[in-house]
Amino acid sequence: MISRYRMEHPIGSSATPALKNGLRYFRRSLQHAGVAFRVVAFCLFALFIAQANGQGPALQPPPGAKIVNLTRHRGYFNEPSVAINPRDPRQVVVAYQTGARIVYSQDAGGRWRKASGTMPGNYAVSGDVSVAYDNLGHAFLCYIAFDKLGTDEYWGHNATRNGVFVRRSLNGGQTWQRPAVPVIEHPTQPGIPFEDKPYLVADNTHGPYAGNLYVGWTHFTLSQSVILFSRSADDGTTWSKPIRISTQAGLPRDDNGAAEGFSGVVGPDGTLYVVWADGAHVVFTSSWDGGRTFAPSRGIVPIAPPYFHISDVDRTDGFPVISIDPRGGNGAGLLYLTWSDYRNGDVDVFCSTSADRGRTWTPAVRVNSDPIHDGADQFFQWLAVDPVTGAANLVFYDRRDDAENRRAVVVLARSTDHGHTFDNYLWMGEPFDSNNDFIGDYTGIAAYGGRVYGVWTEERPRSSRHQAGSPLHHTVVRLGIADFADAGSSH
């Protein structure tokens, strides 16, 4: 190990003063030391070297760590979403694109099967999937479907027919009802808008609007982007006429400046809390009447633009995600908010909390535990607060161990002290390079009773020679499981 260290980290003019002084002390200490002292001294010095070079201790896997390959082959697979049935936590459902593909488990992730009846009909493409369980244990799938996109990044320019759709499963995700129910749909005609990035929220609380379903999304036109919203009070059978909930309009381009990235959560009293990004802020609003009306939206956290360039990734964003600990906040719940931006020079993941229904928010806490300003990017975070334990869980890609800032692993971060600090765990330790492929716009995570499920996209290695008939895209969807229920309070 000493010779390996010398090869990779020579002590010379580039070494820090602390490293040089430590080496001198280490050599002097060993001259008259016994064997036991030498072993202890070497271990301590190895830790000192790692810290002196800006590296913390190696991350450990979370308790009960398990990785599952959900796609058996490579393809254009990305943007996964995961949900746990609160009526029966053994039931877990995962959706991913392209197409609205579903896999499900009836035994807490022990075995996974493909669902039937989920692929959309009558449209060429579908995606931007999300899943949720309602208070009855019914599973719901939301997605967009269209024939082709509009002008590059300007989806409302020359868009073809498109819409937002929802499907329901009455047996935990095994089979899905047809046809899909349109939340909003546009037939083919000149000048139609484009509906993008919907996200589904279910009220599975015991509040006055229990059972309600909510969908928010970005509505692109030729001149602007706004956040639209619709609700269902009859188990997803019908949906209300969409209303605009963004006070300020965004730019018409699917990029910085757009009103985009809807995320929502329901508090224990039935209040719906919603966030998105507008290019300069995390924007927040809420509804106290089951989604009929909303307060004026307002910026709550200034952020660097949510779209940013990361090497070897087709595109990257830091859209906000909101979740809630129903046991906190003086009965109203403790809200958690996460996003990522590059305020520190490289991309980091941040978290803030609110104990007063979103009126005020705590200063941003950096979630990733690598040294600040180390040049490593952490991105595509997603958040889930365990409704049973109150622990906040985040999943994200992490490049802290790659000096070139290209290869990523997957990290699970967890807070048990109301978001003040986060423990980082190495969930997937096989680094991958995205190779400029599209790995989606988001990951996913769900937690219940100490058991955590995370889903993400990975680029798989390509062969040196492209063979005819081989897939043009090389991504897979994987799932990680962690179990803190039997790990003790120290975790």
Each model region followed by its residue ranges:
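N-terminal secretory signal peptides that target proteins for export/translocation
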Residues: 1-35
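Generic alpha-helical structural signal
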Residues: 13-14, 44, 72, 434
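Bacterial N-terminal signal peptides
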Residues: 29, 36-48
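Extracellular, repeat-based ectodomains that mediate carbohydrate processing or recognition
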Residues: 55-491
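Bacterial Sec-dependent signal peptides at the C-terminal "C-region" and cleavage site
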Residues: 48-56
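N-terminal regions of proteins, emphasizing targeting and processing segments when present
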Residues: 6, 15, 39, 43-44, ...
